[in-house]
Amino acid sequence: MAVRIDGSYGEGGGQILRTSIALSALLGRPVEIVNIRAKRANPGLQPQHLTGVKVAALLTDAEVKGAEKGSTRLYFEPKTLKCGNFSIDIGTAGSISLIVQTLAPILLYAPCPTQITVTGGTDVAWAPPIDYMRFVFTKVLERFGAKLSIELIRRGHYPRGGGRAVVRAEPVKRLKAVESEEFGNVVKISGISHAVNLPPHVAERQAKAAREELSKMGLDADIAIEVRNDGLGPGSGVVIWAVSDAGNVIGGDSLGERGKPAETVGKEAAQKLIAVLKTRASVDPHMADMAVLYMALAEGRSRISTSEETMHLKTNMYIIEQFLRVKFSTMEKAGRYTIEVEGVGYNR
């Protein structure tokens, strides 16, 4: 019997689709999602959502109904989980990072190592930048015992996309629980300030502004400058991440856009990082949204803390509870939110 998910629940966006498809593919359970993105100005499935569905279907030989642009209803019934080498093209500047969110849990439980080359947007609005996924997401997954890497080949910005990244994953038998309520002491802050098809001073000014903002808090940052001229269109951005002596990693990011000074871009990224550091939370809000799935799949009790209980986070926990016999608990304490769950110890 299919799990039935109301796509308009909570934040009512693409996150519901991504989590539902990932868990359906992983567990081999059919899912029917209705009212997909019903509250959005452009409701229904968009190209990047369709790409995630199609790749998940490719990896599982799934039977799919309703996978077309604008569709508000989708039926997904997976068969056999596959592995190997695959290439996909979103066909727009749709976010590669959001595709990775869908695929990562599936790839970790595939029967053999898998490599997927994804073409699309690496640094686009309303999605984590690719550098966040490379240097925060994958490092947090390591704490769960997962081996997943992301290699950046070329950057792609809105509206033309054309970015490319290679995702590689090693199969895991079981994920292990993570207990980390406090960030710990900062060991190092690193970052990348990039500019594509733009003057080098854009990346330099972004990095300088970020460093200056961090220095006000007594923090030093090693921010690399990356200037490229191989993009289909111009774009820039900054991602900064902090590593603690407890092994935690949190990030802050900002995207350049027409009319937005480079200094503002750098300052925003630093301020986001500082805001989380001040709470001493073990993960940032972006990562909390994603981490709860791995907590639920892991063996044993996991506990993390984050600086903000977002609607994305609440929605994701609800969707996970529809597929797995888990119950999340959240508690606000000392300016941060602690999330706890007893994982199912899933294995294939």
From Swiss-Prot:
HAMAP family for the chain: RTC
Record-listed ATP binding positions: 101, 286-289
Gene Ontology molecular functions: ATP binding; RNA-3'-phosphate cyclase activity
Active-site residues, record numbering mapped to chain: 312
Keyword terms: ATP-binding, Cytoplasm, Ligase, Nucleotide-binding
This protein's record includes keyword Nucleotide-binding: yes
Enzyme Commission number(s): 6.5.1.4
One of the GO BP terms on file: RNA processing
Enzyme class: ligase
Compartments reported by the entry: Cytoplasm
Reactions listed under catalytic activity: a 3'-end 3'-phospho-ribonucleotide-RNA + ATP = a 3'-end 2',3'-cyclophospho-ribonucleotide-RNA + AMP + diphosphate
Disulfide bond positions: none
Full protein name: RNA 3'-terminal phosphate cyclase
Protein source organism: Pyrobaculum aerophilum (strain ATCC 51768 / DSM 7523 / JCM 9630 / CIP 104966 / NBRC 100827 / IM2)
SUPFAM superfamilies for this protein: EPT/RTPC-like, RNA 3'-terminal phosphate cyclase, RPTC, insert domain
Keyword Metal-binding applies: no
GO cellular component, one term: cytoplasm
Gene: rtcA
Domain of life: Archaea
Entry's family note: Belongs to the RNA 3'-terminal cyclase family. Type 1 subfamily.
InterPro entries recorded: RNA3'-term_phos_cycl_insert, RNA3'_phos_cyclase_dom, RNA3'_phos_cyclase_dom_sf, RNA3'_term_phos_cyc, RNA3'_term_phos_cyc_type_1, RNA3'P_cycl/enolpyr_Trfase_a/b, RPTC_insert
Described purpose of this protein according to its UniProt entry: Catalyzes the conversion of 3'-phosphate to a 2',3'-cyclic phosphodiester at the end of RNA. The mechanism of action of the enzyme occurs in 3 steps: (A) adenylation of the enzyme by ATP; (B) transfer of adenylate to an RNA-N3'P to produce RNA-N3'PP5'A; (C) and attack of the adjacent 2'-hydroxyl on the 3'-phosphorus in the diester linkage to produce the cyclic end product. The biological role of this enzyme is unknown but it is likely to function in some aspects of cellular RNA processing.
Pfam families: RTC (PF01137), RTC_insert (PF05189)
NCBIfam families xrefs: RNA_3prim_cycl
